[in-house]
């Protein structure tokens, strides 16, 4: 049990109870099985990177695999190898955060994530055919890095304004050169938002299938209120209401009045019973 999961009077949260049940169920398959590796994904489309769960490092989505299978945005070869290790009871190095927690006798995020309804509902499907492509229920996406701010806790990778500044003036003198232009090479270098992006194209090809399974969908950036893809999502949701969808937008809320009013108009429409929750 983790600190804070149970109060002094013995009350146990449903979150904890579900995690404990998930642990018992996961252990019937293997001591390293984690449903998040199948049912959750964060997609960084400007760089063609993804991960399932926030703890493992991002890995590349081979662009050539998307032509005939847009779900390869999530079901990458690398991720399938990690899933295979989990089914064999082996502990992937990238998940060391959870292994450390569990070695101390605590529940880890592996148990908490696997205990959430969006993940646990497909336990039997995954166990029956773990190497098959699967549609995630919890998706976070950033479509491009266009942003009007350059917040110090962010990165030029996620802010076109900051990227433009370091190109003109050079990097801030930090001990680790994480905002230096030379740091953003290869997969760290975002595709400019003004250019065609094969990862975004693949996302929209996959979207109708993905949407059917979605329960949690979060759009980040860049600044999503500046991005046409955000409003394309809104239009689709309004045309295809989904009563179990939790829709989330992470915004700096510092856009022009025109964009702010446009966003508010969509929020009013979305909050009239089209989805379960908007934030």
Where are these regions (language model features)?
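Accessory C-terminal segments flanking Radical SAM cores
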Residues: 11-117
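N-terminal pre-triad scaffold of radical SAM enzymes
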Residues: 35-52, 129-157, 215-218
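A short acidic (Asp/Glu
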Residues: 38, 53-56, 109, 151-155, ...
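Well-ordered, non-membrane alpha-helical segments in soluble/globular domains
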Residues: 77-80, 197-204, 230-233, 259-265
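Detector for the c-type heme attachment site
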Residues: 99-101, 154-160
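Recognition helices and adjacent regulatory flanks at domain boundaries
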Residues: 106-137, 147-149, 170
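Core AdoMet radical
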Residues: 136-146, 157-198, 211-228, 240-261, ...
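Leucine-rich repeat
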Residues: 204-210, 234-240, 265-271
């Amino acid at each position: 049990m983790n600190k804070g999961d149970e109060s002094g009077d013995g009350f146990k949260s449903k979150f904890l109870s579900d995690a404990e049940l998930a642990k018992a169920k996961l252990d019937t398959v293997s001591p390293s099985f984690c449903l998040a590796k199948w049912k959750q994904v964060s997609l960084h489309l400007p760089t063609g990177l993804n991960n399932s769960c926030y703890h493992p490092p991002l890995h590349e989505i081979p662009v050539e695999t998307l032509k005939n299978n847009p779900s390869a945005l999530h079901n990458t070869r690398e991720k399938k190898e990690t899933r295979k290790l989990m089914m064999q009871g082996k502990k992937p190095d990238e998940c060391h955060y959870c292994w450390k927690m569990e070695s101390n006798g605590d529940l880890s995020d592996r148990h908490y994530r696997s205990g959430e309804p969006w993940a646990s509902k497909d336990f039997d499907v995954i166990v029956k055919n773990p190497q098959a492509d699967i549609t995630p229920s919890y998706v976070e996406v950033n479509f491009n890095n266009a942003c009007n701010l350059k917040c110090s806790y962010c990165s030029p990778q996620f802010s076109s304004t900051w990227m433009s500044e370091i190109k003109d003036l050079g990097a801030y003198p930090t001990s680790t050169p994480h905002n230096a232009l030379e740091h953003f090479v290869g997969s760290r270098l975002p595709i400019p938002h003004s250019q065609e992006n094969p990862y975004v194209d693949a996302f929209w090809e996959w979207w109708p299938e993905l949407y059917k399974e979605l329960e949690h969908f979060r759009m980040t950036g860049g600044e999503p209120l500046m991005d046409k893809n955000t409003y394309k999502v809104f239009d689709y949701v309004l045309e295809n209401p989904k009563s179990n969808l939790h829709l989330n937008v992470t915004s700096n809320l510092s856009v022009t009045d025109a964009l702010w009013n446009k966003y508010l108009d969509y929020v009013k429409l979305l909050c009239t019973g089209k989805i379960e929750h908007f934030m």
